[in-house]
Amino acid sequence: MVILLAYFICFAEYCMVYGARCRCVLAPFFNQSFLFMHPFILKYYPEDTPLRRLLLHHSEQVANRALQICDRHPELGLNRDFLREAALIHDIGIFLTDAPGIHCHGTSPYLTHGVQGAALMRKEGREDLARICERHTGTGLTAENIRQQGLPLPESDLLPETLEEQVLCYADKFYSKSHPERERTVEQTAKSLEMFGAEGVKKFLTWAELFE
């Protein structure tokens, strides 16, 4: 009962900020809705700021696409509730990075936001969410990619492996926090991944065949 009350309080706060646009998740009571103030969001983004609003907007975009994949492909047996939570948390580390164009005023390179978020989630005892955070850059990075490109990341394979990790990574690629109003097509998204090499584009197109 205490937990349920806490969720309703969080929902009321969100209503005051977003008005009629708001939606919340109080699974299993509102299983088809998404946005609610997850305890980790309240902990790391306690105030209503442009960054928190952008994070929630982007998270909802990613969640909606991921849940559409769940609906289209019940044969995949995807964990719907986990995907919803993963979409909310996957970018939680962005506040630690230096990307003022999207309201991030930390000190680390933006490329590290995944591993930064993973570190936070491991401190919270959530290895499943840590993996989501660190494995959604591009279509995933290998230790060789990181070493050859001199990326500011640990030299280890950071590849989405479970179906949920792959769906989250795929859904995320259609949206950019620097242009939050846009939704890329499959073709535009494939083009945007060319910076990660031909293998990344190939993997994305394989996902498109599986998930669309």
Task: Cite the ranges covered by each PLM segment.
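Divalent metal-dependent catalytic cores for phosphoryl transfer on phosphate-bearing substrates
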Residues: 75-186
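Acidic/His-rich, divalent-metal-binding segments that scaffold phosphate/diphosphate chemistry
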Residues: 30-110
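Charged phosphate-binding loop/patch that engages nucleotide di/tri-phosphates or the phosphate backbone
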Residues: 195-212
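Leucine-biased recognition of intrinsically disordered, low-complexity hydrophobic segments
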Residues: 4-5, 26, 35
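Cysteine-centered motifs
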Residues: 10, 15, 22-24
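Intrinsically disordered, low-complexity segments enriched in serine/proline and basic residues
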Residues: 20, 27-28
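Extreme N-terminal basic, low-complexity initiation segments
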Residues: 1-10
